[in-house]
């Protein structure tokens, strides 16, 4: 045990008084050198980290160089009386102003493009509405023409039908009148019934009709012709 923890008197240690923080730091370092890693804890790492502020300062300085403060690089942001934010440029060369001018120009260009698109869309809608209105008028005219043409065809059909019907009625009346006249003339002849019967048959081919021999009937009618005293005359 005495070998691991030799008396402090045997060590060449300078106990020159310094501020409390340096004494604590030197004491911890000496203890760490003597004991090594055998009794090292997480608290020792924390104390060592706190005892080396110079390293942390270097890291903070490197971070600030890589990522400078926005307010110090591009200007401070302040609020006016109306509560709107204003940006004051911290660059003497006006580079930040140029960046904001470029941004505002791009924004205005975008708004101009939107206005142009809106105007183009409105013009297209107006043209489309005019085209639809003209198409509706043409369709209405075509519809009216078709209706007039259909009415004309229907009228022509009924006119033609009525004319044909009247003509057929006239022809039928004439045929009936001619038939009645012929009938009256036929029965008004000064002859016998057998004479009129003989007029109704074809004397040239009256011998065979429908495969039957009619020559005997023809011979009888020829004998009764002109005989007013014959039975049934």
Curated annotation (Swiss-Prot):
* Comp. bias regions, Acidic residues: 56-67
MF terms in GO: calmodulin binding; clathrin heavy chain binding; structural molecule activity
Q: Where is this region: Involved in binding clathrin heavy chain?
A: 144-204
Specify where it is mainly localized: membrane
**Coiled-coil region:** 125-186
Q: Specify the protein's topology with respect to the membrane.
A: Peripheral membrane protein
Task: List, alphabetically, the InterPro entries matched.
Answer: Clathrin_L-chain
Keywords assigned: Calcium, Calmodulin-binding, Coated pit, Coiled coil, Cytoplasmic vesicle, Membrane, Phosphoprotein
According to the UniProt record, list the residues that bear Phosphothreonine: 49
**Biological-process GO terms, alphabetical:** clathrin coat assembly; clathrin-dependent endocytosis; endocytosis; intracellular protein transport; positive regulation of endocytosis; protein-containing complex assembly
Biased composition, class Basic and acidic residues, residue ranges: 17-43, 112-124
Map out region (Disordered) in residue numbers: 1-124
Cellular component terms (Gene Ontology): clathrin coat of coated pit; clathrin coat of trans-Golgi network vesicle; clathrin complex; clathrin vesicle coat; plasma membrane; trans-Golgi network
Instruction: Give residues where Phosphoserine occurs.
Output: 52
Q: Where does the protein end up?
A: Cytoplasmic vesicle membrane; Membrane, Coated pit
Q: Where is the composition biased (Polar residues)?
A: 69-92
Hey, which family's this protein in? Belongs to the clathrin light chain family.
State the remark under miscellaneous. CLC1 binds calcium, and calmodulin in presence of calcium. Present with 3490 molecules/cell in log phase SD medium.
Q: What does this protein do?
A: Clathrin is the major protein of the polyhedral coat of coated pits and vesicles. In yeast, it is involved in the retention of proteins in an intracellular membrane compartment, presumably the trans-Golgi. The yeast light chain is important for cell growth. The light chain may help to properly orient the assembly/ disassembly of the clathrin coats.
Q: How does it assemble?
A: Clathrin coats are formed from molecules containing 3 heavy chains and 3 light chains. Interacts with the auxilin-like clathrin uncoating factor SWA2.
- What protein is this chain from? Clathrin light chain
Q: What is the lineage of its organism?
A: Eukaryota, Fungi, Dikarya, Ascomycota, Saccharomycotina
**Protein's gene:** CLC1
């Amino acid at each position: 045990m005495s070998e691991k923890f030799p008396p402090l008197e045997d060590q060449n240690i300078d106990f020159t008084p310094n501020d409390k923080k340096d004494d604590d730091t030197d004491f911890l370092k000496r203890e760490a050198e003597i004991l090594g890693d055998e009794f090292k804890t997480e608290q020792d790492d924390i104390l060592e980290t706190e005892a080396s502020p110079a390293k942390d300062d270097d890291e903070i300085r490197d971070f600030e160089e890589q990522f400078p403060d926005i307010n110090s690089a591009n200007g401070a942001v302040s609020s006016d009386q109306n509560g709107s934010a204003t940006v004051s440029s911290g660059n003497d060369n006006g580079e930040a102003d140029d960046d904001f001018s470029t941004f505002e120009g791009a924004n205005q260009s975008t708004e101009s493009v939107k206005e142009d698109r809106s105007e183009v869309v409105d013009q297209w809608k107006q043209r489309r509405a005019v085209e639809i209105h003209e198409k509706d008028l043409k369709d209405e005219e075509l519809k009216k023409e078709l209706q007039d043409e259909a009415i004309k065809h229907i009228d022509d059909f009924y006119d033609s039908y009525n004319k044909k019907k009247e003509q057929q009625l006239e022809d039928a009346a004439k045929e009936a009148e001619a038939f009645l006249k012929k009938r009256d003339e036929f029965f008004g002849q000064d002859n016998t019934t057998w004479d009129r019967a003989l007029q109704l048959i074809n004397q040239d081919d009256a011998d065979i009709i429908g495969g039957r021999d009619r020559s005997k009937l023809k011979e009888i009618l020829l004998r009764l012709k002109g005989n007013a005293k014959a039975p049934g005359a």
